[in-house]
Structure formats: structure tokens, C-alpha cells
Regions:
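Extracellular glycoside hydrolase catalytic/binding regions
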Residues: 1-110, 114-129
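Carbohydrate-binding surfaces of carbohydrate-active enzymes
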Residues: 131-141
Length: 141
């Protein structure tokens, strides 16, 4: 409440959220701070970083459900850091109905620069950026 009041004192227009890392992936059933109605009522939307682990897509899907508290839900950082691109796609497909927005992690280089070996990760980042570019541009109905 104190943080939101301080922001609203200077800016009544911009949306407010608190980004979190997905502790529910590590501790099944863990609830984020904004799960509390006293906290949630002050937020305009919920945001979380999500990095599914290889072989644990269902666990990641189940963990994301904890963050669905009746507010718009944005996965504000996602990347196949610990899973394959195919597993990340499964995660996105299985949760897209409850996620209102997706923002990927970006390394500051073009696809071509990554193809030519830009660090970090080079070719794997190029493949992800191509995937993400192909996924983009969809509007929710």
C-alpha cells in the first residue's frame, strides 16, 4: 500500500505491479505476496518471470496457476534457459488461455548477430528469437 500510494502521488495513470520469480516452481503450493487480498487490491496486474525446467512442463503449468488471482497476468520474462524450445512452446500453449501478455528475455543482439556467435548463447538465442518472432503479433480476443 505504501509503495502504491507513493507512486500514485506522482502518477495516477500508469499501471502498477510487483514482479516475482516463480517460487511455486520450487516450492509447490507456495503463494506469492500478492496472493493476499490486502496486497492484490492495490495492483493493476500480476507479473512473474518463468523459466520451465526440462522434463517438468506440467510442474511449471501447475505452478503458474498460483499466480492467477483474478487480475491480468503477464509473464514478463520467459526463455528456454533450462528446457528445450519445444518444451517452452508446450508451456506457452498450455498456459496461454490464462496469460494476458508475454514478454521474452532479450540479449540486446539481432538474430543475425546471434547466428554469427554473439554472446551469450549464440545459435540457441537465434533460434529462440526466430520462434518468438513467429509467435508474436497475436491479439487476444
Amino acid at each position: 500500500r505504501q509503495m502504491v500510494s507513493a507512486i500514485r502521488k506522482h502518477d495516477a495513470d500508469h499501471l502498477i505491479t510487483v514482479g516475482v520469480i516463480p517460487w511455486a516452481q520450487v516450492f509447490p503450493g507456495a503463494k506469492p505476496l500478492f496472493y493476499s487480498p490486502e496486497v492484490a487490491r492495490h495492483l493493476d496486474f500480476v507479473s512473474v518471470h518463468f523459466y520451465p525446467k526440462s522434463g517438468e512442463v506440467k510442474k511449471a503449468v501447475d505452478a503458474l496457476a498460483v499466480y492467477d488471482i483474478g487480475k491480468p497476468l503477464v509473464v514478463e520474462e520467459v526463455f528456454p534457459l533450462s528446457c528445450s524450445l519445444e518444451e517452452l512452446d508446450q508451456f506457452i500453449q498450455q498456459t496461454d488461455d490464462r496469460v494476458d501478455g508475454w514478454i521474452s528475455h532479450y540479449f540486446g543482439r539481432t538474430i543475425q548477430e546471434h547466428r554469427q556467435g554473439a554472446e551469450p548463447a549464440g545459435e540457441s538465442v537465434a533460434k529462440f528469437l526466430e520462434y518468438w518472432q513467429a509467435k508474436g503479433g497475436r491479439q487476444k480476443q
